[in-house]
């Protein structure tokens, strides 16, 4: 399974960056984007709920959910990310609340229907070849009324557009261009487009927000600036 996953360039890229992923998540920009995403949950009581972190990386956000009382299963296609997640979970969070598994893709989730009260999918869908198939799987494993907390690249972000231009220009002169992740990050959308896509898969958008840039929150959370759209949605009955 791990060998098959490593055949895909986006997985090899995430394997390569796994050793520095946790450090990156502790940066001011990443802490701000995580806070903006979790703000959509507000003070919701998650104690005792079962959540899936679909594309968990090194488990940073899985541990935040576990700290709120969730039993969290984190899955990722990158073997190195999962190895790091397993090695870093002893941080005060009860170990029994965290399970990490390497799987080939979130387009085929190895869980029964209606298994989870919530699904977290943070900056993952842009790297998968079939977003619709992944959303169908997320819908399948969510219980009716269950929540999806998801972030995807903001198509309307002027800052993201400038990143893409810089990536394209630097790719012509360097084997390690600026914003390397953009070589693998393909999917982006507007809030309206995501609302329609979610609706097609039995999910109702409840709230949205913007984040992801290194700029102060007053700018970062503007629709034309934030490089990510954060979305809270609910599975219909």
Task: List each model region and its residues.
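Conserved class I S-adenosyl-L-methionine
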Residues: 1-46, 48-57, 60, 64, 92, 149-172, ...
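Short conserved loop adjoining the S-adenosyl-L-methionine
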Residues: 108-113
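Class I SAM-dependent methyltransferase SAM/SAH-binding core
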Residues: 58-107
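Acceptor-substrate binding/catalytic loop of class I
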Residues: 177-193
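A conserved beta-strand element that flanks and buttresses the S-adenosyl-L-methionine
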Residues: 120
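A short glycine-rich, Lys/Arg-flanked "PGG" loop and its adjoining helix->strand segment in the class I
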Residues: 132-144
């Amino acid at each position: 399974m791990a060998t098959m996953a490593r055949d895909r360039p986006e997985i090899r890229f995430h394997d390569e960056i796994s050793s520095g992923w946790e450090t990156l998540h502790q940066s001011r920009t990443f802490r701000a984007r995580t806070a903006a995403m979790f703000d959509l949950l507000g003070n919701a009581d998650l104690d005792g709920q079962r959540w899936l972190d679909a594309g968990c990386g090194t488990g940073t956000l899985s541990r935040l959910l576990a700290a709120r009382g969730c039993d969290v299963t984190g899955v990722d296609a990158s073997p190195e990310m999962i190895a790091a997640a397993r090695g870093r979970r002893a941080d005060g969070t009860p170990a029994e609340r965290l399970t990490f598994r390497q799987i080939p893709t979130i387009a085929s989730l190895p869980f029964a229907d209606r298994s989870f009260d919530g699904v977290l999918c943070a900056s993952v869908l842009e790297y998968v070849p079939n977003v619709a198939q992944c959303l169908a799987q997320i819908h399948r494993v969510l219980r009716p009324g269950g929540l999806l907390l998801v972030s995807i690249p903001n198509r309307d972000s002027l800052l993201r557009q400038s990143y893409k231009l810089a990536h394209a220009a630097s790719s012509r002169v360097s084997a390690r261009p600026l914003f390397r992740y953009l070589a693998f990050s393909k999917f982006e959308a507007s809030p309206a487009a995501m609302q329609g896509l979610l609706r097609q898969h039995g999910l109702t958008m409840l709230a949205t927000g913007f984040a992801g840039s290194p700029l102060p929150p007053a700018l970062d959370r503007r629709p034309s600036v934030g490089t990510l759209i954060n979305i809270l949605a609910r599975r219909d009955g």
